[in-house]
UniProtKB/Swiss-Prot annotation:
Family: Belongs to the UPF0182 family.
Composition bias type Pro residues, residue spans: 1016-1026
Taxonomic source organism: Frankia alni (strain DSM 45986 / CECT 9034 / ACN14a)
The protein's name in its UniProt record: UPF0182 protein FRAAL6027
Record keywords, A-Z: Cell membrane, Membrane, Transmembrane, Transmembrane helix
Alphabetical list of Pfam families matching this protein: UPF0182
Organism superkingdom: Bacteria
């Protein structure tokens, strides 16, 4: 009965298990096919299908080759172990126990053999397929045209061939070791190895089999020692990267000796086939291990300790020279030469006023601090947003005087923010068919403000787009904040921003070629599987003309189109030929440049901005010792077109990848002038180079060894503990005839916080990549950024202002602390923004601090702050660069005034606020005077504190936003005729508390808080149409 009851169970198990396996295989196949096919459709949509097929074919080839080799090797050794099994086995407890396993396995021996070989082959094939980059570099490697100084081999051997040889060696070692393992197990299972049986413990056949494998292992070890010799050029044993004195005079000879010992051991293992016992193999293995310890370890350590250490500077000198030359060449800094810069501190007001190349262009808007300001002033609708960190670019525009001037702007695009939709609007149709794109390019001159707010030249609080940049297509379907996917060209119209009425919307239908056609049921089903959304298959709104947009982040699109590139972490938008275009910098890297110092990209490119920014990607923790900005990439914001341009056509790594992926990178000559005008020196590359310049500006090996003149990147003065980021500024450098668009960074001494150097590189097409490295006198006294920040905030005037602002219910935000070469010295400039605490405020510029030497100045404009440092007239070139009305300054430093209104009145009325500020200032001074008396007058001090508290209370009341903000219209009112704005119109008096903005509603832009309490607000005039 028991047997009968089990039969149905066993029968069901025999049916269910294969069915479940079949279903699992079908699901896996469908999932893999769906992903691969939809990826192929993406690559076809951007005309990079050759990249997809090349990578897939290469991975399949590697999978088949290495998987098959591993499977055959493992399977062959199992077969040999089984075939060479003894026919008769001595009777013992061990063999009796093993017999049960033999009886269970032998009927299914072929199945076991195939299964074991398949498992190892599958694992090896999958592992090898991931090394497609190594394979393609080896197959297509181009010459560097430079040889290493030790072995005189072309650098391409170390960059392309050596990594593949190492991979192949590792694979073969793994195959032989696994073969040895399965061979020993097979012989043990079938009686060829008997551990607990008297007499012969290993049969001759098993001994021969194992001896051959051990001989192969010794041969591979000899090859490993041979490759180790070339690997010494990456050694970190000495003072600098590369083969050191000990490596050349001890390690290399030791590796050669160990190579021959390994060959001798291989001979002994093979010879052991004809000998009894294991004496010879054990002797050989013992000699190899002992030699590795003595010759490979103790001897080099002895040389290092007793020959090198006592005379290390002299012994290592030629190898340090090699490292310096190789590192400078590998990172593209071989032509960066320090030039002496006195950094004067005895500068007059007239000399500062005469510096019209830098002072008028000083950046006052910090792109990492003003996202909230752009959001409040330019959001327009709740379903639009701006990234956390804005970007900087430069544009040449025609001013009111018909002259063209170039200046830098803080720029961004108005991206789609579906999180801003109401709860009743969150449905699949709205999120994927209706709200599909952002709209608008927004730009504000970085050196200009209007009542503390950006003076937008492009992207005013209205659509369609108006401004100076001739934006003809401003829809953003591909952006940093775009949804995962959208379906366009459906029966649903797309929301395209606010209409002319208060509650109206403009609609549109996508007409571009971007994305993938999704008209067929087959494709709809595939994308429904990919995105896990049944509506893609069932929706009646999708037609034969519909297209699905996915992989929409510009960085992701370029990364898929060029998977061999390392991309800069900061894509930025620009207006190119009337279209919004994302620009990205692509790097070719290698870790195979002999003698070059290695850096971890994720470490050296991290700073205080990347640590806090949500839209700047951090580099991976990849070690490199060679890098080039070899590719400039663009992504069209409307149709997603990806274009790659060869920027450094001499780069051998780029040439190698172009050979592997032909016709995917366009030549440099195809870059249009409109695009060329917006290319800039990449930030991540500059961070790597400035880190290296801190050491490798030293060319003398003895000085390099002493490390006395090493520099480092300063900590950010914001207290984050991260390195200070570099800054893009439009400025005139001492070795240039005029202002240029530069990426800059100060460097401090590695032994103190004093400023040691100033580093800048140009982004202008005429002198792109030209470095300026200003070296300050040794033992200088110019403070570094952190020291300057402390000095500014401990200054009495600054402390007073900060106390008043913070006491009035607001918080202060320090902007970027810029270091600028001005009038033969170094000027620090830091804007101060103020915003109300809570969710309704946004930062407005209310003060500017300057520092020069030991002198600190603070004012409501840059000119005022400069006058306080240098004396009257110093700030003439910076007229208007501050918190007052809009005044723009051209590259030549001549100020031109734009038409418009006087700007918003402070909440609560100007006179009431000013009275409160004056009373607070007087009370504070009275208290300080009372304390300075001898003895202190504490009665007077107490009365002063009471008066101060009363003044601050009035300030809080006047500055508080209204509890119910007034309704906002979608389009700001415009004045009938523009009025002239002078530098005095609407200027914020010293100590004025900034206006606080109420949050923008879904139907329009924000309104100034407290507007009902003050005088009527005069509207700002619209800029002339672009």
């Amino acid at each position: 009965m028991a047997t009968t009851s089990r039969r149905p169970v066993l029968t069901r198990a025999k049916v269910i298990v294969p069915v479940l396996l079949a279903v699992a295989l079908v699901i896996a196949f469908v999932a893999i096919f769906t992903r691969l096919y939809t990826d192929l459709l993406f690559y076809r949509s951007v005309d990079f299908s050759k990249v997809f097929t090349t990578v897939i074919y290469t991975r399949i080839l590697l999978f088949l080759i290495f998987g098959a080799v591993m499977a055959v090797v493992i399977g062959t050794n199992i077969v040999l172990g089984y075939r060479f099994r003894p026919q008769l086995r001595p009777l013992s407890t061990e063999q009796q126990n093993l017999e049960r396993y033999r009886s269970a396995i032998e009927p299914y021996m072929k199945l076991v053999l195939v299964a074991v070989a398949a498992v190892f082959g599958l694992a090896a094939g999958l592992s090898a397929s991931g090394r497609w980059r190594t394979w393609l570099l080896w197959v297509n490697g181009e010459s560097f045209g430079t040889k290493d100084p030790q072995f005189h081999r072309d650098i391409s051997y170390y960059a392309f061939t050596y990594p593949f040889q190492r991979f192949l060696l590792g694979f073969l070692l793994t195959a032989v070791l696994l073969s040895l393992l399965v061979t020993v197990l097979t012989h043990y299972l079938f009686g060829g190895i008997r551990l607990q049986t008297p007499g012969e413990r290993v049969t001759p056949a098993a001994k021969a089999h194992i001896s051959v494998l051990l001989g192969l292992l010794a041969l591979l070890k000899a090859w490993a020692y041979y490759l180790d010799r070339f690997g010494s050029v990456f050694s970190s044993r000495g003072v600098a990267t590369g083969a050191s004195y000990t490596d050349v005079h001890a390690v290399l000879p030791a590796k050669l000796i160990l190579l021959f010992i390994s060959l001798a051991c291989a001979v002994l293992f093979i010879y052991n086939i004809f000998q009894r016992g294991w004496t010879l193999p054990l002797l050989g293995a013992g000699i190899l291990v002992l030699s590795s310890v003595v010759i490979g370890g103790i001897y080099p350590a002895f040389i290092q300790q007793f020959q090198v250490r006592p005379n290390e500077a002299t012994r290592e000198q030629p190898y340090i020279e090699r490292n310096i030359a190789a590192t400078r060449a590998a990172y593209g800094i071989q032509n960066v030469k320090p030039q002496s810069y006195a950094a004067r501190t005895d500068v007059t007001a007239a000399q500062v006023a005469a510096d019209t190349g830098t002072v008028p262009n000083t950046r006052l808007l910090d792109p990492s601090k003003l996202s909230r300001t752009f959001q409040q002033l330019q959001q327009i609708r709740g379903y639009y947003t701006f990234p956390k960190t804005l970007d900087v670019d430069r544009y040449t525009v025609t001013g009111a005087d018909k002259k063209q001037t170039t200046r830098d702007y803080v720029v961004s695009v108005r991206e789609l923010n579906q999180a801003g939709l109401g709860a009743d609007q969150r449905n699949w149709i709205n999120e994927h068919l209706t709200y599909t794109h952002g709209k608008g390019f927004v730009a504000a001159p970085s050196n200009t403000v209007d009542e503390g707010q950006p003076a937008f030249d492009e992207g005013e609080q209205n659509l369609p787009q108006k401004g100076d940049f001739d934006v003809r297509e401003n829809r953003v379907y591909f952006g940093e904040m775009s949804p995962n996917y959208s379906v366009v060209g459906t029966r649903q119209v797309e929301i395209d921003g606010p209409g002319p009425g208060a509650d109206t919307q403009v609609t549109t239908t996508y007409t571009g070629d971007g994305g993938v056609s999704i008209g067929s049921t087959f494709r709809q089903a595939l994308f429904a599987l990919r995105f896990g959304e049944k509506n893609l298959l069932l929706s009646g709104d999708i037609t034969k003309n519909s297209r699905i947009l996915y992989e929409r982040n510009p960085r992701d699109r370029v990364s898929k189109a060029a998977p061999w590139l390392t991309l800069d972490g900061d894509p930025y938008p620009a207006v190119v030929n009337g279209r919004i275009t994302w620009i990205l910098d692509g790097y070719t890297t290698s870790d195979g440049y002999p003698y070059s110092a290695r850096r971890t990209l994720g470490d050296v490119t991290a700073d205080s901005v990347t640590a806090q920014s949500g839209n700047r990607a951090r580099q991976a923790a990849n070690q490199v010792n060679y890098i080039r900005n070899s590719v400039k990439a663009t992504v069209d914001a409307y149709d997603g077109t990806v274009t790659l341009y060869a920027w450094d056509e001499s780069d051998p790594v780029l040439r190698t990848w172009m050979k592997a992926f032909p016709d995917t990178v366009k030549p440099k000559k195809d870059i249009s002038p409109s695009l060329m005008a917006h290319l800039r020196y990449p930030e991540d590359l500059f961070k790597v180079q400035r880190d290296l310049i801190g050491q490798y500006h030293v060319s003398d090996p003895r000085d390099f060894y002493s490390q006395e003149d090493f520099w480092q990147v300063s900590e950010s003065p914001d207290g984050s503990g991260q390195p200070q980021p570099p800054f893009y500024v439009y400025s005139k450098l001492p070795d240039r005839s005029g202002p240029s668009y530069n990426l800059t960074s100060p460097l401090i001494s590695a032994r103190s916080s004093k400023l040691a150097a100033y580093m800048a590189v140009s982004s202008d097409p005429s002198n792109y990549g030209q470095f300026t490295l200003l070296k300050l006198p040794p033992g200088g006294t110019i403070n570094g950024p952190v020291q300057v920040q402390n000095a500014i905030e401990s200054n009495g005037d600054v402390a007073n202002k900060l106390t008043l602002w913070r006491g009035a219910g607001s918080q202060t935000i320090e902007g970027n602390l810029l270091t600028l070469p001005v009038a033969g010295g170094l000027l620090y400039v830091e804007p101060y923004y103020v915003q109300a605490r809570g969710g309704s405020g946004y930062p407005t510029l209310q003060g500017i601090a300057t520092a020069f030497g030991e002198r600190i100045g603070f004012g409501t404009s840059l000119g005022e702050a400069l006058d306080k440092v240098f004396g009257s007239g110093a700030g003439a070139a910076a007229a208007g660069a501050g918190t007052g009305a809009t005044t723009t300054t051209g590259g030549g430093g001549q100020a031109t005034t734009q038409g418009g209104g006087t700007g918003a009145a402070p909440p609560g009325g100007t006179s009431g606020l000013q009275d409160a500020v004056n009373d607070a200032d007087s009370a504070y001074k009275a208290g300080q005077d009372a304390l300075r008396k001898n003895p202190p007058d504490f009665n007077a001090y107490g009365q002063a504190q009471t008066d101060l508290a009363d003044a601050l209370s009035r300030l809080r009341t006047l500055a508080s936003p209204p509890t119910t903000p007034p309704a906002a219209s979608p389009t700001p009112s415009r004045s009938a005729a523009p009025t002239t704005r002078g530098t005095a119109a609407g200027s914020a008096p010293p100590g004025t508390t900034p206006a606080v903005a109420a949050p923008a509603g879904p139907s329009g832009p924000p309104s100034p808080a407290g507007a009902t309490a003050g005088p009527p607000q005069q509207p700002r005039a619209a800029p002339p149409p672009g």
